[in-house]
Amino acid sequence: MIKGTGHMIVNIANDRGMSIDSIRKTIKESVLIAYKKYFGSNENAFIKFDDDTGDLSVYAKKKIVKEVKDSLLEILEKDISKENIVEGDYAYIEINPKVFDRLSIQVAKQRTKNDLQGIEDNEILSEFKSKLNKVVIGYVQQNRNGDLYVNLGNTDGIIPKKYQSPREVYNLNDKIRVLVYNVKKGKNGIEVILSRTHPKFIEELLALEIPEIEEGIIKIHKIVRDPGYRIKVAVYSEKEEIDPVGPCIGQKGVRIQSIIKELEGEKIDIIPYSKDIKEFIKDSLTPSKIEHVYILDEDLHKALVVVSDDQLSLAIGKMGQNVRLANRLLDWAIDVKTSSQFAEMKANSEFKQETLEMFDKVMQDVVEEEQFEEISKISDLKLLDPSVISNLSKEGFDDINNFLQADEGVLFNLGVSYEKQEEINKILKEGMIIIANDNDESMEKVEEDEELLCPECGVVINENMTSCPGCKIGLSFEFEEE
């Protein structure tokens, strides 16, 4: 018996978080390797762990014979000692592991080390896979090139710099809550990737602090976050009588403040989710107060929000943060305007309608293709960059009629500045046209010649034509002699 092995196995199990059975199995396999290395075979080897102490014993199973031909497998009855175990025709002779040579022991030790590491890795992998997307508690061990290494008990995890909030700073041995983001086998063992920026981390914190979320009474529609600065959480309840926001805030804000404290003061907006998109848009832009919401394109998820002048900065947020988070929460593109800006847009809209009518009238008068080139596309004006023209074409706004009827904010989002819109509108308002052949003599000739019209469509024609440039009907001319 190898005394102390039972105690050693228990210590390894406690230190590494491994099961005693898995450690015993590994040690048994390693001893069998040493046995075979020394004796040449381990077919008759028998390994036993004491029921009381857990200590290891190694036996050689030998057949009791009157004449020994193979000392490894056979034994004389007279050579069996009282300590040996006899079962029928076989005796179990205890082997002192000290008989193994150094090489056999070294091979067994290396095998044990590798196997124990493999078992430990598999158990850690299994444990943390079951904790994926869950919050665990650890202690900061070190900061290496911006990455935080966290002691999780039986292993270490790492919070890459990109998964850390810029607001948070940690010192050695600080207690920290983290989300188990990913677990995988790496070159140096199991890698446990942690995060404090993932939306799931916020969801887990909310569930820990708010029983109604944990119990499913209140549900989370979506979470968006600009780590270190602001979080927006849309919540709802399937029971109409339940206010989804109040329980999340808590009495005197105690629940939400607990989470804000955990995030080192990061702002959190709890927003009631609504299927009424206008209401949802209004609430998503909290803390600002919204006057009106206009749906510009329901299919493309585009909307215009109007706020008072003093609410614009709140609605947009610092560096556009508030409206950007709202866009992500809604999956809509929101354009925010002040009341005064919106009034100006309305005036411009009426102006565009007048311009459109005037433009149509002018173009109706321009019918002679030999003299004039009709402008039907904004791209013909050569006033916008190709990329902007491409954007307009995709939305159908390269067509002048569509352009004039388009909302000013929509055009702005496609890359046409308000100044450029004004310039284009002015050109069209003044009825400018491009003269293809502005030769004075040809113009005078048109005025002097008798005007001929196509009998089918009314387009101006002349005797040199064989077909109408308008309707393409075939032409022939007969002139009476004077």
Swiss-Prot record:
Domain KH: 300-446
Subcellular location: Cytoplasm
GO CC term (a single one): cytosol
S1 motif domain: residues covered: 133-197
Principal subcellular localisation of the protein: cytoplasm
Pfam families: KH_5 (PF13184), NusA_N (PF08529), S1 (PF00575)
Superkingdom assignment: Bacteria
Keywords for this protein: Cytoplasm, RNA-binding, Transcription, Transcription antitermination, Transcription regulation, Transcription termination
GO molecular function: DNA-binding transcription factor activity; RNA binding
Gene Ontology BP annotations: DNA-templated transcription termination; transcription antitermination
Coiled coil ranges: none
Quaternary structure and interacting proteins, as annotated: Monomer. Binds directly to the core enzyme of the DNA-dependent RNA polymerase and to nascent RNA.
Role of this protein: Participates in both transcription termination and antitermination.
Protein's UniProt name: Transcription termination/antitermination protein NusA
